[in-house]
């Protein structure tokens, strides 16, 4: 909560797990029919790990999903768009690195590609065609650039 405090990799992973856990709890509460509690849990998860401490990434997807399912569509879409920007920037960097020099980037490339795939599926499920349609093209573009021998 203190400005300027650096979060090392161990702390970042722990806080990523918090985001994911709060999001999954919110989705479980929604499935049980408790929208009010789901929304409370979602905001708690967003508040514990604000974007200025850690960018929204794969581990915030369930929080965005919960917001949309709770009727906070615009807020959820805003988080999705920020996640897409973060993942897109990272993938853009990776495709700029020659394939022979991408050693050590496999995990984060895979995580960010999975982020795109999961957002695409979630967007289709929720009827968010304004996100899904351009994302499908972007996903295919990155796939062809990162995995050219798989085509």
Mark where each language-model region is.
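C-terminal luminal/periplasmic domains and tails of membrane-associated envelope-modifying transferases
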Residues: 1-151
């Amino acid at each position: 909560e203190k400005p300027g405090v650096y979060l090392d990799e161990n702390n970042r992973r722990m806080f990523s797990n918090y985001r994911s856990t709060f999001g999954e709890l919110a989705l479980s509460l929604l499935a049980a029919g408790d929208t009010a509690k789901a929304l409370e849990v979602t905001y708690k998860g967003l508040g514990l790990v604000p974007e200025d401490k850690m960018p929204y990434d794969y581990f915030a997807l369930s929080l965005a999903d919960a917001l949309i399912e709770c009727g906070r569509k615009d807020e959820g879409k805003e988080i999705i768009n920020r996640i897409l920007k973060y993942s897109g920037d990272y993938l853009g960097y990776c495709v700029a690195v020659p394939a022979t020099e991408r050693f050590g980037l496999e995990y984060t490339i895979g995580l960010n590609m999975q982020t795109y795939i999961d957002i695409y599926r979630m967007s289709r499920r929720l009827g968010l065609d304004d996100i899904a349609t351009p994302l499908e093209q972007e996903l295919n573009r990155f796939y062809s650039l990162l995995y050219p021998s798989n085509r």
